[in-house]
């Protein structure tokens, strides 16, 4: 296929769009791949659509290879299936809801577990029909509170979601393993640098869950890796090693002190050391203090907010993402001034677990807050703290919670050294859902003994449109994009940079011969555009190979440019053969 730039629907830009913050957003707009329609909503222009279709094809090939069968559900869905699983309320404000002219409730699909489960129920009834894997590549909708970074975090996006149905848990594990391997092949073929991380299941439910994160400094997700092992996890899924329980007998009684200048952890530690408080024979450190963070939570469908106290060691900050993941599907917000005014027992800066428990507030503690540990914390009175408050004696948490920040150098699980932190972009997520959705829809199948059984599900998602932005993040330089051959809209960009008639005719011939060899060609045949502009556009658009017919053509040579790599002079009669070989090698 040959596409001529003289007729291609394209306008490149020299300046970054005003609302763009990350490289992928800037370059995809400047290069004419996408165009903003509304916050978080983008049009796909011809070049962008070709690249998107190439990604879809790689995904489709690998899904078909593991026995997946493609179908397509509507994006406009009725309320009832999502009421059955309670996700009509659990999704909260992120769900696009609408009514038809008769007043019936509908939604724009954020994900389709309900549709897959109910369809299998309607069509299959015997164990002989299983296992089965179904998938679709389809547009999804989520009302992101803060859409950002172009198509990295949009409100409309293309996703591949697949679902496996097995009669046994062992079968689910096999389906999960097949999808995991297929995802690795997909991301390897696309040329993405990624990490497989342990993850939380969130609103999806289920047991085992892993994320595929593309390594990127601009990623919204933080993940950790062990220095001496293969452990990797999204920071939300990191489990804190519990503290060592201690005997309570013999510990000194808790004492309340006046602390007029100790509203911060730093001043509290300084005060404690100034009056000679010690811990195990040493000076007090921030980790000996206990922060009591007050948050409010609201369960799906509820109108009222409820207070919750979150206890973390004073040397740690609360990580809101970890906190939200631990309390999901409830909404979570930090308590604000109005809440402190509403509840007089909340003394800002001096809240402690005793006062919260006394007033019926749920208290959740960091796993390090175990029986026998002694703390310095708020005494629930202005300018007062308590020293020697012992867990299991003076207060007992209602449960434990993963809410404290994870830091570089924290111990890794199972003795795998320490943790290092990095940023990433979620590109895939796989779940062993189990029977949450098949039970909700009463999917009953007759097993080989003629008894009714409920199949188990796996759920597997890939952010297809996000992959284009991820590749742009990972594969670009100051001049522009640098696509891998599997994704590039065209493999070769032929540039006629010489106005000599013979050179222009040769460029036409090269484009035709490359096309006949099965290579997609973008041909810059624009007659009134300078060579300099053509070269800049070629670098901005980012095709893997560029064939330049310039001044050297009269001397029997053309120039081959590998995007982001070498420039080579080739004899005119060897150009096509060389490029075909290089493209085929790059395709693998």
Swiss-Prot record:
Transmembrane recorded as keyword: no
Catalysed reaction, written as an equation: tRNA(Pro) + L-proline + ATP = L-prolyl-tRNA(Pro) + AMP + diphosphate
Keyword terms of this UniProt record: Aminoacyl-tRNA synthetase, ATP-binding, Cytoplasm, Ligase, Nucleotide-binding, Protein biosynthesis
EC number(s) per entry: 6.1.1.15
Record family assignment: Belongs to the class-II aminoacyl-tRNA synthetase family. ProS type 1 subfamily.
Domain comment quoted from the record: Consists of three domains: the N-terminal catalytic domain, the editing domain and the C-terminal anticodon-binding domain.
Protein name: Proline--tRNA ligase
Organism name: Corynebacterium efficiens (strain DSM 44549 / YS-314 / AJ 12310 / JCM 11189 / NBRC 100395)
